[in-house]
Amino acid sequence: RKCIGCKACEVACVMAHNDEQHVLTPQRFLPRITVMKHEQKRNAITCRHCENAPCARICPTGALQQDDGIVTMNAQICSGCQLCIMACPYGAISLESIGLPSATSETMAQKSMRSVAVRCDLCKDWMKREGKSVPACVEACPVHARSVVQIG
C-alpha cells in the first residue's frame, strides 16, 4: 500500500508524545516521523531501528541503547552533541529543546530547557499507557501504508 501524503502519521506521532500539551502550534508540532514527497511519490521517513545502529554505537553518553532490536533514548543523559544525527543514515534524528530537571535541581518542578536528540521510539510509552499493540503512526494511517516488521 502506498502513502498518500496525508500526514496523519505525523499528527498521531505528535499527539502520542505531547504530554497533554496543545500540539497544533508550530512551536509544539515536532513529529518523530516526516512525510516526504518526491515527484509523485510520498513516503513517511522515521527511524529504522537498524541492526547494529550507528547512532547507538557513536553516542558518547550511552543515551542511545539498542535493546531487543529497538533503539531506545534516555533524554536524561543525552548531551545534545548531535553525533547521532550525523551518524543516522536515514536522517531520522532531530534536536529538540525540552524541559528536563537541571543538573543542580532535584525535582521535575525545577526544569531547565536544553537540547536533546529526539527520534522514533515506536511509541513504547504510549502503547503501554493506552493499551495499544502498534505505534500511533501505524494506527492512524488511513490507507494502512505503515506497519511494524518484527525481525528475528
Which role does the model predict for each range below?
Residues 1-152:
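Non-ligating segments of multi-cofactor redox enzymes
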